[in-house]
Amino acid sequence: MTTKKIYISDVTLRDGSHAIRHQYSVEQVRTIAKELDEAKVDSIEVAHGSGLQGSSFNYGFGAHTDLEWIEAVASVVKHAKIATLLLPGIGTIHDLKAAYDAGARIVRVATHCTEADISKQHIEYARHLGMEAVGFLMMSHMSTPQGLAQQAKLMESYGATCCYVVDSGGALSMDDVRMRFRAFKDVLKPETETGIHAHHNLSLGVANSIVAIEEGCDRVDASLAGMGAGAGNAPLEVFIAAAERMGWHHGTELYKLMDAADDIVRPLQDRPVRVDRETLALGYAGVYSSFLRHSEAAAQKYGLKTMDILVELGRRRMVGGQEDMIVDVALDLLKSLEHERIHAQPVSSEAG
């Protein structure tokens, strides 16, 4: 049994933004942050779903700017630290400085699981600002445990004090998680913390988070009602209930989280955050969870099945940042269906 305090990192106001196409109002953000703060989570991540400056044609326009959301949270929190997410190439060090000035004190610098080298500038600048810098290795199922650990070691060398296994596709099994944390332990300094960011596409979000803690993981990402991309993240209230049952020290107020999940967050969902045919396809095919809403829009526009688009994206091993390829895949599928339709027509012949 683990006796250490588990660091609870809430992502409702960042990853959860994907579930409602980045349309949180400032008042909703303020209300949710206040509930989370009173429930004593350790940090609250705030940004567009795709991180600082993610609001764009490619990723979807936000109802407000990142700074407006961060300032709203800063106006109500008294206990939790404010975190934000930055993807190099989308957000810049100038955006990071603005987020710091607005109240963010932790930045998770996110890269694809094989591209840790592009995080150097941003991690170093975060440390220069006095921020806590966290390395966030997305789509972790696409790398071997040892390969992922070497990428984490790079982030550590740049100044990251915590490195995450990020299951962006919700595709990792419990053994997959176990092996990745053991690989991290083999190469990272003892003082470098580790974290798990799970998605629930195979219904393993909570189970994988528990396995991570059993393997010595320090931090768990979770969200109220699982609010997040795809089938959502590990539901915060469910993970906390499980941790409570196991006698783990989490420091949060379970009933307050349960009330916030059902009374405040779940009613905001315009599409239920759950495991269904489409979100299951994400986990099965190992597809970036935030592709869901974009793929549904493309399927509706071109008269296709969302699942077919997602499975093809997985076959092509598309990764975060390639949202523009979703329409290309849809058009290719449409062309293929038309080709099959033409060649399936019976050929008429004239009798002699």
Swiss-Prot record:
The entry's keywords: Aromatic hydrocarbons catabolism, Lyase, Manganese, Metal-binding
Catalytic activity: (S)-4-hydroxy-2-oxopentanoate = acetaldehyde + pyruvate
Pfam families named in the record: DmpG_comm, HMGL-like
Residues given in the record as substrate binding sites: 14-15, 168, 197, 288
Site entry (Transition state stabilizer), positions: 14
Active-site annotation: 18
Binding-site positions, Mn(2+): 15, 197, 199
Highest rank taxon of the organism: Bacteria
Alphabetical list of CDD domains matching this protein: DRE_TIM_HOA
Single annotated GO MF: 2-isopropylmalate synthase activity
Pyruvate carboxyltransferase domain boundaries: 6-258
Pathway the protein contributes to: Xenobiotic degradation; biphenyl degradation
GO biological-process terms attached to the record: catabolic process; L-leucine biosynthetic process
EC number: 4.1.3.39
Matching HAMAP family: HOA
UniProt record similarity statement: Belongs to the 4-hydroxy-2-oxovalerate aldolase family.
Protein name, entry field: 4-hydroxy-2-oxovalerate aldolase
Gene it is expressed from: bphF
